[in-house]
Structures are given as structure tokens and as C-alpha cells.
Amino acid sequence: MSKVRIYEYAKANNVQSKQLIESLKSMGVEVSNHMSAIDEETLNKAKQAGKPAAAKGQGSTSNQKQNSQNQRSNQGQKQRPQNNQQNQGQKQRPQNNQQSQSQGQTKRPSQASNNQSGAAKSQAGKPNQNRGGNRPGGQGRPGSNNRRPGNNQNRRNHGNRGGKRRPQSKVNHQQMPLPEKITISGSHTVSELAAKLHREASELIKKLIGLGVMATINQELDKDTIELLAADYGVEVEEEVIVDELDIELYDREDKEEELKERPPVVTIMGHVDHGKTTLLDSIRNTKVTAGEAGGITQHIGAYQIEHSGKKITFLDTPGHAAFTTMRARGAQVTDITILVVAADDGVMPQTKEAISHAKAAEVPIIVAVNKIDKETASPDRVMQELTEFELVPEAWGGDTIFVNVSALTGEGIDELIEMILLVAEVEEFKANPDKLATGTVVEAQLDKGRGPVATLLVQSGTLNVGDAVVVGSTFGRVRALVNDVGRRVKTAGPSAPVEITGLNEVPQAGDRFQAFEDEKKARQLGEGLMARYREQNLTASSKVSLDDLFNQIQQGDVKDINVIIKADVQGSVEAMKGSLEKIDVAGVKVNIIHTGAGAITESDIILASASNAIVIGFNVRPDVNAKRVAEAENVDIRLHRVIYNAIDEIEQAMKGALDPEFEEKVIGQVEVRTTFKVSKVGTIAGSYVTEGKITRNSSVRLIRDGIVIYEGELNALKRYKDDAKEVQAGYECGITLDKFNDIKEGDMIEAYVMEEVKRA
């Protein structure tokens, strides 16, 4: 049976600890003090055994109280005339004045004797003991001083504090039972939790001490501690869900199944440069747009619709992968289907691999369009073979990826491609509710001189009407005009329809969500709140995953897997590093390789890393100038290595939280080799121009050719004209020789850097 401390049992059962201890000792139970732990059955027996003694004690106590009250009342009757003499400012009866003087003089010795006897010790020794007239039998008399704040009523209660106030406080606790459930949001202080549980804070502090937690009344308690305390009282804890009133998604109601209707699919075309993406788009548009529309003035708004066999398809004309990734980075899932364009004569190229990585990261179906099959050098089978390496296996070979051979120039295969798009859309069952306020995403936005802010919107659900109040990202306004993809004004736009709107107060960003409202006042209020939040967010840098704080984010539950982009000088190194990283599994956190490639780290790699919250690992390669600039702006972590085991060990140690302080490389300058001179006994002298920063005599250098590190070491000599130089600033020419290396060519880049010791966060 569970044991309970004596003082806790006494408090819960409204008995005195002293009585319980005496009863337990009389029963032969060894008890040291009130903190001793005894089983409840023994305490119940001790409580029953102690009842007669307690009753007797209460009787004697009541007799003593009665005697003391009688003595006070006698003294009050004898000494009451004295009050009239002291309260001279009040009305007095003349016949009592003389009596009060004589009686006051005659009764003082008896009063002194009563004070010494101890019948009224709390009142006798004070000079103003008789000023108050609130004693028993003395209320309502003319001489009583009821208006004085510190009268004898308070003094009497103060004297009886031990006998009256404690039982009264216990009664109050019994009147406030424990709640069945409490609601919390975040952490609470001990006093706040005590108020919710209808208990004293001191009681909670004692329980916390029992749990090994030393807490004060104002100390914050976390959720786990609150749940432990509540469970001890048998109270259920419910966590309050904090609703963000500025979240646009809250204003989009859920659709019922019977409200959903079929909508056109939204298609994005991606692929390598010069593989015919734009030509394919133009071919689809020219063959499928009706003659009447084709004859009119077509306004390019970044998206357009075609109709085939009575069904519509929406195409997004996004310029390259950057816009696609930027929109996805902003949380916009716009695309339903991705068409991967691959030239039959070129095969899989670097940007093709990037497009595959982007499409897979967005988790959308991929249809491969093998373009340029009209060329003599076309080899569609080679394209299929190369794409199997990226898990894109043709249906003819037992896979699930649709391959279509097309020619954008001749129009061959265009109809089949469109039919395949409609087939995938039918299988995926793209649906939306057209009978509600519109929601969707910004495709493009710009500031027009004549019309002001102009935004191209893709309606994803509901119907947008002219005159609707809309909130677009952190901007707001009323729709003044709707223009469709062929430049005609329309009054409404349904699901999957691209339209251009005017009437916003500012230019939104691509990828922003929009929501239509019936109440313009509500839209304005929400838009202003979002604008204020957007400005605050711009002041704080966005949080990206980096190896320095990776372990902390894992501990906090912010990171469940690590997205990694691998770039190396050769494909063999890429495969080796990929295989080693995929085997790492620390603390249940998995390494997820989202993109690999051979060659220098480019701007598109950084954009993909930013969108996917990934870390870029470079092996024997360097980022180009644009990649460095974007990485710095987007706070993308780039890790460069020359030894493959160092890269693997660094990630593994970061996941374990055991990274040591490191030396961080700081690039101080870029130098371009413009000419070379070969001198006997000296070697090759590089006639160079400092394009950025500076180069110093004691700095380390690396020679980069076409993004590949050729040499890494020290300077042998740095000269300006014929003189040795300690450093050369940007905009000046200099002569450079490298230590034990002479294979320098025109166009090479020399990167100067120093190593600075830093401590990891």
C-alpha cells in the first residue's frame, strides 16, 4: 500500500499532525516527526483512535474560550463608562461623566490585576485598549468609536487568529474543487498553474520538491512538468491551439466532396537550355489556340490555356528553373504535371538533371517529351537509357514514366503529348470547388506605368470576380479589371484559370498566396497586418540549416532529415560520396541526397538548396561568383573539401553534436591570369590583374580553371613591376609565381584566402 507523509494526511483529513503522532505512538508505531511516511491504513486507525481525545480537547478548549469571554464581558461592563471619558469629541451624557471618573479610578487596580492574571493578555498592555466599542454587548452605544479604521474589532480578530482563520481557509479550499481539465498554452509559472488547479502555490512547490524540481512561485514550468503535476491531481491537460489570425489559409473553408468539380491541369515545361522548351510551347499554343484568338493581339502574362477535345489545359510559362524553385520555396504548390523536355540528339544534360531534381522535390508527375526527333542524329532510345539512371523508366520497359517523341518544328507528336497530359490528369483526378471565394497563387507581378501594380494570378479554387476584395501576399486591394491570357477582359475566372488583375496597393511577389473576401474592410485589415509582419521578417535573417547548429535543431525536433546537394570534380567522386553519406544514420536523422552533379557549384545549385533547405557539399570544386553572392543572400551553407572522408566525418560529427572549433576559410581576393611568362630557373610567371579584394604575400592561394581546383598552395613571389609587394589591391596588376607549380594558363583564376579560427555556435 502506498505510504503518505503524516502532515499531508493530516492536512487532507482536517486533523492535527500532533494528534496523529500521539495516536501512532500509543499504537506502538515508531514515528520521528510529521515528515515520516506511514501507510494509509495505519493512519486511518490512528485517526479513529484519536477522535475521543480530540473531542475532549475541543470541549476543554470551548470551556476556556467561554470563561475568557465571560471575563472580557465583565471587564467591559465595569469599564464601559471610561470610554465616554476618553472619547470627548463624541456626544456624552452628563450623568455618566462623574460616574466614569470615579469608577475609572476605583477600577484601575482591579484592571491591573486582571491584566496580570492573563485573561486578556492581547489587549491589557495597550494604552488604547478601551477605545473600541465593538465588544459583545457594546455595539450601537454612543461612546463606541466604530468609524476608526484600526478599532478593537480588528484587534479581537488578531487575538483569535489561531482559532478562527485557519479552519475558515480550509473551508474555502473545499469550496473550490479540482477542475476536470485545464487548458495551457506554452509554459506557465507556478502561481499561474496553482490558480488553474485551485490550489495554493506552496502546495505545488512541495510537490515539485518531491519530484526533484526546486522552483519558486514565479518560475516557469515546461509542458512536461505541468502534465506531471496535473496527473498527480488527476486533472487532464489540454494544450491550447494558438490561431494565427493573419494566416490567409484560415479564411479558405474546407470543401465537401459533393462540391468538388473537375478542373483543368496546370502544366510546367522544364529542361536544358536549347532543347526546345520555348519552341514546344509556341507549337502547342499556335496549333491549339482558336483562329479568332490567334488573330487578336495576344498579351503574354506568363500563363495560358488551350482546349483539346473539349477539355482545357493550363500551361505556366516560367522562365527557367529559378522561378519554379522560388515559387516552391515560398510554399506555393502550383504545378500539377511537369513536362521534361530532352533533345533526342543531345541526351541528358546538366540542366536536365537539375530539372529532374526540382520536379522530384516538388513531388509532381513527370512526362518526358523527347524533342527534335526530326533530326538525323536523333536517338530516343539513348535518352530513355540515360533517364533510367534517375529512376525515370519508360512504360515500354516496365516502368511508370510516360515518354512521348515530339518535334516542336514539324508539330509531330504534339497531339499525343496533349492526350497524355489529359490522361495523367484523369488518373490524378484534379478537382476544385468553383462555388466559393477564390484562392490561388501569384505567377508573375510587375509595376506598369499606366496601370500601377499588375499581378498574374492562377486561380486554384473558387471563382474570382471583378470588384472582389483580395489579399495578395502582404498586399491588398479590389479587383478593378480581369484580363485573360489572350488579352480580353473577362468578368469571372474559375479554377486553373490564369488572369491578370489590377487594383492592388503594391506589387506582390511570385509565389504569394491570394484570398478573395466579401468584406473590403476585413481584407484591408488583414493586408495591413501582413504588411507589418512582412517588414518585421525582412529585418531578421531567414533560418537555414547549417552544420554549425545542426545538432541543436535535431535536439529541438526542427530537423528530421538533412537535405544535401553534392558537387564534385568528377562523377566517380560524386558516386563515392553519395554512397557514403546515405549510410550515415545518427539519432534517427537521415541524410537525403536531393541533387548531385560534376562541375563547379552554380547559382542554380544554391537556388535549389535554398528552396529545399539543403546543405551544399563541394569536393574539389569551388562556387562561382554568382553562386557565392546568392549563397550569402540566401544563407545557404556551403562546405568545401579536398578529402572525401573529411566531408563524411564532418556531417556525422555535426549530427552527433561533436564538432570542434574549426579554422574557417576567408577569401580575401580574386586574381585573373591575363598572360604568362616562362623564365629559366624561375618558372612560369603569371601576369595577373586583381579583380576583387586583395592578394597578400603570406596568403594561401588556389588556382581554379573552369571551376575545377588545379592547384592549392602558397605564393612563391608577389611583385609589382620589379619590386616585391606585401599586398596588391583590386584594380592593380601584379606578377605571381606559385610554389612548385608552373602549369599556369591564361584565363585561370587565382583565389587568395586566409584561415581564421572560429568557434562553432
Swiss-Prot record:
Residues 317-320 are annotated as: G3. GO terms for cellular component: cytosol. It holds the Pfam family GTP_EFTU. Residues 106-120 have a biased composition (Polar residues). Residues 262-435 form the tr-type G domain. PROSITE patterns: G_TR_2, IF2. GTP binds at residues 271-278, 317-321, 371-374. Transmembrane segments: none annotated. The keyword Cytoplasm applies. NCBIfam families: IF-2, small_GTP. Belongs to the TRAFAC class translation factor GTPase superfamily. Classic translation factor GTPase family. IF-2 subfamily. One of the essential components for the initiation of protein synthesis. Protects formylmethionyl-tRNA from spontaneous hydrolysis and promotes its binding to the 30S ribosomal subunits. Also involved in the hydrolysis of GTP during the formation of the 70S ribosomal complex. This is Translation initiation factor IF-2. The lineage of its organism: Bacteria, Bacillati, Bacillota, Bacilli, Bacillales. The gene is infB.
